C-alpha cells in the first residue's frame, strides 16, 4: 500500500525524517554545549532547550495535520477493503504496521542524518557566538533515546486517531469520504463579518502600541485575533467573494473563469483551512527570519550603542540627593563636575598602568521607576497607571553631549519619549515642569537600564539642583525608603596602551575606583552579546526549517488533493469541447487565484505588525529600525522566491494528476 501510494507517502516520510533529525540535532547540540563547559554555555543551553521543546509541540501538530491528508485519500481504499471482506480489526492491523514502518523509517533516516550533521551544527553555533571549535565525531545516546521516545508517543497518538477514524465509519461512508466537500457551502456572512472584525481588531492592537511594554502585552492577543480573523476570512469571506464574482456575469461566463470560480466555491470549505494555515506559517517564517537576521547583523552596532566607549563606569552618588552643593562651583570644564575621588582614581590608575584615557563622555543621570497617568509620573506603589522608566538629565550635560545650545528657564524641561503621551505641563512626583520642546531623537542606549520592556521618557531639566529635588521627591513617595533612587555619574572613555597595560587597567578598575556600582568593559561584554544573539540566530534557523517544512507539505498535499478532485471534473470539460490548452490555462488560473493569496496576506500581516515588532526588538537592545526594515524586505523577497519555486513544482504535479 505504501509503495502504491508513494506520491503521498514519500513526502510524508521525508518530512517525518527531517523533523526527527531536527529534534536529534537540537538535543545533541544542547548536550555538547553542557559537556564542553564553554563560557556562556548557560545562555546557549537555555535557548537551545527552549527551541527543542517548542519544536516538539510543532512536530506533533504537523504530523497530525499531514496524516489527516493521507487518511482522507485512503479512506475510500479502506472502504473497499471492508466490502471485500476485511474486518475493522484487520484494518487496524494494517494501520499498525503502516504507522510502525513510517515511524521506523523516519527514525532511522532522521537520526542517521542527525548524527552526520549534529557536529557541523554545533560548529555552526560556535561560529555564530564567536568561539573556536574543532570537528569531533560523537553520538550522545541520550539524544537518540529522547528522539525515539518522542516519536513513539507521537506515532502512538497518530495510530489511535487513524484507528478511531476508520472504525467509527461504515464501509459506505469510507467509500464516500474522499468526495466530501462537494456540496456547495452556504455563504456565512456572520462568520465573514466576525473574521473581518477580529482581523481589524488585531491590526488596531498592532498599530496602536507606542511602547515596548504595550507591544509585549498586546502581541499575543493581536496574534490570536489575526489568526482567528485569517481563518474566518479564508473560510467564510472567500466563499462570499467567489459568490459575488459568480454574480458578475461579464466575469463569470468565460470558460476559464467559469471553471475556476465554480470549482473553488464547491471545495473552498476544505481548501480554505489549508490556505489560512499556509498564510499563518508564512507570516511566522517572515517574522522569525527578519528578526533573527536583524539581531545577528546588528549585534556590533547594538554593542557600541549600549557601550559607547571601551570602559563604561556607573558611579552612584548618594550624597547628591542630600546636598546639591557637593558639586564644585567651577563650571569651566566638564571634569570639574566629576566627583573628585572618582576622577583622581582614574588618573592614578592610568598613570600606574601606563595607559591613557581618551574620548571621554561624562554626565549625571537620575532614573525613576514610575507609573504614568494623565501627564503625571509617580513612584508611589500601587498606582494604576502604565509602567514607565523615567530619566532625568541636566541641560549642561545634554548640550555638551549632543552639540546643542538650548536654554531653559526655571520650571521648564525638554522632553523625549518612546511612547508616553505627555503634552503641556508634566507632573513628576509632585514637581511641575512645562515642556519647552519635544526632542525627536535621543540615544537612549547610553542610559543605565534602558533595555527594559516599559515606556522610556527623558526629561532634560535646567540644572543639577532640579535632579536633586526630583530624587528627593521620588524617594519621599516610596514607603519605608525601599529601593530609593540615586543620582549616578556616567563616565565612559576609551583607553590607549599596550595589551598588557589595558588588561591591567581593566582588572584593577573595579577595585580601585570608588563609588562604582557597575563597570562594563566592551571587549568583555562583546562575548556575552555574541553568545546571546548567535544562539538566537541558531535556534531561529531551526524554527525557519520547521515552518518551511510545514508550509511546503501543506501546499503539496493541498495540490494533490485538489488534483484528484479536479481530475474527473476536467475530464468532463474536455469531453464537452475544451481543448487541452484551455484546460491547462484554466488550471494555471485556478492555482494562481488561490496559491498567492496566502503569501499576499502574510506580507500584509508583517507590514501591519512591523511597528509593533520594532518596539519589541528594543527589549533586545535593537533600536535600528532601518536595519530591521531592510532585513524584513529581504526576508519577504527570499521567501517569495522560495514560494514561487514551490508553486512551479506543485503546479506541475497538479497538472499531471488532472491530465492523467
Please state what every model-predicted region is.
Residues 302-549:
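Basic-flanked hydrophobic alpha-helices used for secretion and membrane insertion
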Residues 4, 73-83, 173-177, 243-250, ...:
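Short amphipathic alpha-helical coupling elements at transmembrane boundaries
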Residues 7-34, 43-79, 100-113, 227, ...:
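Hydrophobic alpha-helical transmembrane segments of multi-pass inner-membrane transport and secretion
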Residues 20-32, 65-69, 102-131, 143-168, ...:
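Small-residue-rich transmembrane alpha-helices
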Residues 1-7:
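Aromatic- and glycine-rich beta-strand/loop motifs that create alpha-glucan
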Residues 168-182, 564, 655-660:
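Short cytosolic juxtamembrane segments of multi-pass membrane proteins
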